[in-house]
């Protein structure tokens, strides 16, 4: 009981204690809450009260701690002294501050003067360097002039022959006539200009028998020829047209011979005469057979061996297009390479070889004698076997569906009309031409007709019979355009044709197109070729190609050229010596006579042909490097005198592989005077600049009060006859340099960019070198070409709004390129730059060269260019596809690189400098 009672009491005591603790905690919480409430309520009220009375307290403080009314404190002596000291110090501080500002202003002015002096010193150093370079160049030029032992060549001065001939000893037989014994060279001095006198056929009896179409075509081309003269006394060559005759008129040989010998300038033997017998039909007879032509040359399409004199007479082409120019739109494209038929032949043999020979011989006897065997039967059997094998699709027909055309004996007669034959040849990769079996025939009119019809439509001629004498064979490399196969190899012809690669086949097709267009397509080309052939044989240079006479617009110059704020700093490097007056023109006509002696094969077998003498070409030979140090250094400016070097030595001389030269800026403009003036000012101080030719394309003259900038070189403002973009590429006579920088009036180019482009062009003179690149893209859905200006890793064009090219291409663009292209440029007022790229790539088979990273040009303040218009691009698409039709193929080629200077992004030692700072 006791333990239990105690337990109960103990438990009761602990419970009371717990209750007390709970009550105490509650009291504390209550006081804490009350305290917080009082603080939160009364503290903001108190703060609000004091804040509202703050202004009154400030006023009271001012009254307590501030200066007393009446300067009560200043009545004390030491306080007054302190006040005076404070005022004195304040005044001194103000004076010192004014002096400090004045000194700072003077220091700033002196710093500006120092900077100006430094700049003047740098400019003086640059001027001194320029003067040293000019002095060095002048001394070098003087030494070259004193040491020069070669006469300076220029346009030949005409030396004309005397009226009377000295006479030539006659050869034993006219059959042995060659130039050295039947041609009077004394009437044709090298500088005579090759004057040609053309007889008027109507004044002679045979003139009334001439085919009117042939006579009209011949007279028209003779009147327009640059060599033709009306003064027979000074003529080097005399030309007479005797055929083709009208049907059925046949002039007897004796009668024709009598009329020839009665020509007023025949001089007993006809030396320096050429008798032309043009044929329009395949059956044109050999009019001059059995006619004694004396020492006169004969030019016709049909020759017998007994009358043909190699190296003296001329095999000419038939007159296919008598009066009309060929239509480029009707000529099939050169691509695809392979056409429907591998080869075709249509013809019919009217008279066999055996029946034409006066004495019948066996096949074996013919093989042993001079005349070749009659392989016609073997040829027919072989070609039919190829056709029956069906390995390739070929078409051979040895009988005509209709009446065959008249032809010479042993010759394969033509089938059908010309239009029908051309349609078949358009489907043929190769065109077989079987030469006549008559060994007496050197060439026949029918065989020549087959040859030129094949060339016209791009069927590669395959001539069976190596004995044939093709037209102008002395000059033309026919192996580049045709296959000449001996008749005994007829069984191997199929294998030979299948073995040709696409690239070889296209090269032959393109060369054949060039030969046809240049020498055989029109009456003009035939007559010009006959004269060019004789002129080349006697080594007389061609007539100089004409230049466009520049009609200058008078203008006032004198405004000092300003500094372009957009011009990037060229650094410490000079860009080259600024040439002193007078400007240095490129040498002209240095190869007047060597071209006709050493380079006539290239001129005859490459565009544009041998008809013009150019002042200079981009294909002139280059001397080896050591020649400039061993006697042939005239005009060369090697880097460091030959020792080479980095930036400073590089900028002091042009170097390179050709002598020194300058360039001409040609700038086309149209009613943008302010933009033009700004562009001209940016050319101030440009090294190696010879002249600026501004092509004023506007019908309105420049403003009378317009003051042109003085940029240190002449500015020639040329007025044009009409507003045409083709004027950009006219070969103006004011352009006296080989290098032309064609630039738009709104193009911004730094001097270092121009100089780098010029140096690159000097190493690639036959190509366009410039800045903005474009390319041609294949439109897969429409199977055509597109003009594309997007950024690309391939390009095929460099726009001529900022590009260097050779003046040679200006001649070709204006006088040689098909007129249809220039007409389209005028129609769209667009595409002239594309046309120039087509031309250069067609001539060289090379792409252009892009320099620097520029892709477009910005022109702040210029009106919006036409190139931003959608129609501009649509027109350029059309231009590209039209140009392809005219050329017959796409001449543009792709390139995947651009050119930068040699030391660009190269780490150099401290004593070396870069070629260009930014390029």
Curated annotation (Swiss-Prot):
Keyword Zinc: no
Topological domains annotated Lumenal: 52-919
Residues spanning the membrane: 31-51
Sites where the protein binds UDP-N-acetyl-alpha-D-glucosamine: 668, 672, 697, 723, 728, 744-746, 832-833, 876
Region annotation (Required for interaction with REG3A) ranges: 1-140
Active-site residues per Swiss-Prot or TrEMBL entry: 833
Membrane topology according to the record: Single-pass type II membrane protein
Pathway it works in: Glycan metabolism; heparan sulfate biosynthesis
UniProt-annotated location(s): Endoplasmic reticulum membrane; Golgi apparatus; Cell membrane; Nucleus
Residues modified to Phosphoserine: 362
Cytoplasmic-side positions: 1-30
This enzyme's EC code(s): 2.4.1.223
Recorded superkingdom: Eukaryota
Biological process (GO), any one: positive regulation of keratinocyte proliferation
GO terms of molecular function: glucuronyl-galactosyl-proteoglycan 4-alpha-N-acetylglucosaminyltransferase activity; glycosyltransferase activity; magnesium ion binding; protein-hormone receptor activity
Glycosylation site list: 290, 592, 790
Function: Glycosyltransferase which regulates the biosynthesis of heparan sulfate (HS). Initiates HS synthesis by transferring the first N-acetyl-alpha-D-glucosamine (alpha-GlcNAc) residue (GlcNAcT-I activity) to the tetrasaccharide linker (GlcA-Gal-Gal-Xyl-)Ser core linker. May also transfer alpha-GlcNAc residues during HS elongation (GlcNAcT-II activity). Lacks glucuronyl transferase II (GlcAT-II) activity. Important for both skeletal development and hematopoiesis, through the formation of HS proteoglycans (HSPGs).
Protein name: Exostosin-like 3
Upper classification of the organism: Eukaryota, Metazoa, Chordata, Craniata, Vertebrata
